[in-house]
């Protein structure tokens, strides 16, 4: 099966389907991040964030003791920042890897709608 990156919007946008595969992004994240750095845009993995309560629940479910561990707050990013990265990567040879272009296209579709509505977002990973 494998991990998959997916976009979580700050709030729902009526009529927008936010579903995407995201597995290719997950499989190729290191090379995509390297390409983003060379292109002078923010790496995709830096848009990852998770609600601290969800993170704590996951960690406890994996047998880890969270205790007084202070987890970082959930971060939302502007759609415009995400679009800059997605568009730069779409034009790069790194997008030619298996399925990456389709995942980037889905990101661009979702983030374009988010930008029009002024909605923040972040990536989460489905394991």
Kindly label every feature range from the protein language model.
Residues 1-119, 125-127:
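Acidic (Asp/Glu-rich) sequence patches and key acidic residues
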């Amino acid at each position: 099966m494998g991990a998959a990156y997916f976009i979580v919007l700050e709030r729902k946008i009526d009529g927008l389907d936010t579903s995407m595969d995201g597995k290719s992004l997950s499989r190729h994240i290191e090379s995509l991040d390297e390409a983003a750095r060379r292109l002078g845009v923010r790496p995709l993995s830096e848009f990852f964030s998770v609600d601290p309560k969800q993170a704590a629940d996951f960690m406890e479910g994996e047998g880890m003791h969270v205790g007084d561990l202070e987890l970082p707050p959930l971060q939302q990013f502007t759609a415009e920042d995400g679009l800059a990265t997605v568009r730069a990567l779409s034009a790069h040879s790194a997008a030619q890897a298996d399925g990456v272009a389709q995942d980037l296209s889905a990101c661009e579709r979702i983030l374009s709608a988010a930008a029009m509505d002024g909605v923040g977002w972040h990536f989460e990973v489905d394991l």
